[in-house]
Structures are given as C-alpha cells and as structure tokens.
A protein has these predicted regions:
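Acidic/polar, compositionally biased interaction segments
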Residues: 24-237
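Bacterial N-terminal signal peptides
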Residues: 10-18
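Bacterial N-terminal signal peptides that target proteins for export
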Residues: 2-9, 242
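A short, hydrophobic C-terminal helix/tail in secreted or cell-surface proteins
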Residues: 239-258
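Sec/Tat signal peptide C-region and signal peptidase I cleavage site
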Residues: 19-23
Length: 261
C-alpha cells in the first residue's frame, strides 16, 4: 500500500475512533415542547416531608411521590442543596437554613421552614432547554443519599442507595432544539450529612450547577395534561376577605326566600 494511502487510512481510523469516543451515552431526538423565546429560571422544587425514616431507595421515594400531594413547592433556580461550595454537605439543617432567598420567597407552604431536612423526599420537575441542534451535555449528579436524573422518562443518572456524597456522570445528546421533560429525584433518610447537586456542561465544558437559564419550571411551562402537575395541591377555595360580605348576603337572601315559601 502506498504511503499516502496508509496516511489517509490512518487518519480516517483516528477520526472514527475520535467520533466513537465522543458518542453520547443517551440520545434524545424529539422535544416535549417547543423552546420558548425567554430563557429558563429553574425547576419546580417539591418536598415530601417527614416521610418514613426507612425510605432508603428510589423506588420507595417514587412511591411516596405517587401517593400524595407535595408538602410544599417552590422555584429552584439551581439544584444545589445546601447552597454553597461544590460538594458541600450539612448535618441536621432545617429548610429555613438551606433554601435560598428565591426558594423561600416562592414557597407555597412556609410551615416547612422549621422542619429538619432528614426524612425527606424531593423532586425537581420541569424541562431542560436545548437551543441548538446536536447539543451534547455532560451531566453529573452527586448526592448524599440517593438521587436520579430522568429525561423524558429515561433514567439517565442512577445514584440509588444510602451513600456518601458522590454520583455518576453521563453524556446526553439532544438532536433538536426544544424543551425536554426533566425530573431530579432525591431522598435523605439517615441522621448524617446530606447534599444534592445537578451539574451540566455543554460540549465538553466542565459541569457546573450554574445552568439555570436552561431549566424551565413545571408550573409555568407544562402542558395542562402533564401528569406531574397532579402532585401540586389545588389552591384553597376559601373566598377572599372582600368577598365574604357578598357571600353572607347571598346566603341570607336564599334563607329568606326558603322561609317565605
């Protein structure tokens, strides 16, 4: 074989190996929704508090989520709990100590703030925004204890079990722009350190928790038929204070009508 042909063959083989080395672990081709004109601002954080202290697996955590409304919901601009340096964990913290200002300002049940984070199931639900075709993202999900990342119902990162702060890394390719359904699951049931971080990096960049602009919350962007919305308790139907006199007058009128009959 001529030297020039050998060179071309060697170069082609090297390129093929390079492409194979960069092949994503998972590929998603069809977005759940169209990409909005605005950037994202985080996922919908959900808490199921004071759960069974023997909740030690993702399967148990998912059963709790499926079994009833979330105790509280809020806007999670980043998945970084407790907020701090990468890999930071804490012991026996309350929600009031670990939720950032945005989370506390958007919390729909402030009664949870004095609660200890132990014996808790969390879900961060919404969508991941892809701006260009063929984006390849590297995701990592270190946690203490168990966690998982699901994209369009596929478990991309599985970090199940009781363990110290650590987690897997996977690459994901999105072939089309749009919003892709995303859930981050987490549970903590042991009286010890706990923590959770979702990190992402585009096209080989070092993964970081600063990906808020790619995260779109469930409440604002989900289709009304999205079954994840069923975990959010409907608003209390108690009338507004200004409407109470009108309601009272209406009831008195009804009673008077019935009495005359």
């Amino acid at each position: 074989m001529k030297s020039s042909a050998k060179f071309l063959l060697t170069t082609a083989s090297a390129l093929l190996l390079s492409v194979n080395a960069l092949a994503a672990d998972y590929t998603f081709t069809t977005p759940s929704l169209a990409l909005p004109a605005t950037s994202g601002n985080g996922l919908t954080g959900q808490l199921w508090t004071n759960v069974d202290p023997n909740t030690d697996t993702l399967a148990q955590a998912q059963a709790i989520i499926a079994g009833g409304y979330a105790t509280a919901n809020f806007l999670a601009t980043t998945i970084d709990y407790p907020v701090g340096a990468a890999g930071s964990t804490s012991v026996f913290s309350t929600y009031g100590a670990v939720l950032d200002a945005t989370a506390q300002a958007t919390l729909d049940n402030t009664a949870v703030l004095p609660d200890d984070v132990l014996n808790t199931v969390m879900r961060f639900a919404g969508f991941f925004g892809v701006q260009s075709a063929n984006e390849v993202w590297t995701f990592t999900l270190p946690s203490d204890d168990g966690s998982a990342l699901d994209i369009q119902g596929t478990r991309v990162l599985n970090n199940d079990g009781i363990h110290a702060f650590s987690g897997p890394t996977r690459t994901v390719e999105f072939t089309m722009p749009g919003l892709y359904a995303m859930n981050v699951l987490f549970f903590e049931s042991q009286p010890s350190d706990w923590g959770l971080e979702l990190r992402g990096g585009l096209n080989g960049a070092t993964p970081t928790t600063a990906i808020s602009s790619r995260l779109y919350n469930l409440i604002t962007y989900a289709d009304p038929n999205d079954d994840r919305l069923g975990s959010i308790q409907p608003n209390n139907s108690v009338p507004e204070p200004a409407s109470l006199p009108l309601l009272g007058a209406a009831l008195l009128g009804a009673f008077a009508y019935l009495w005359r009959r």
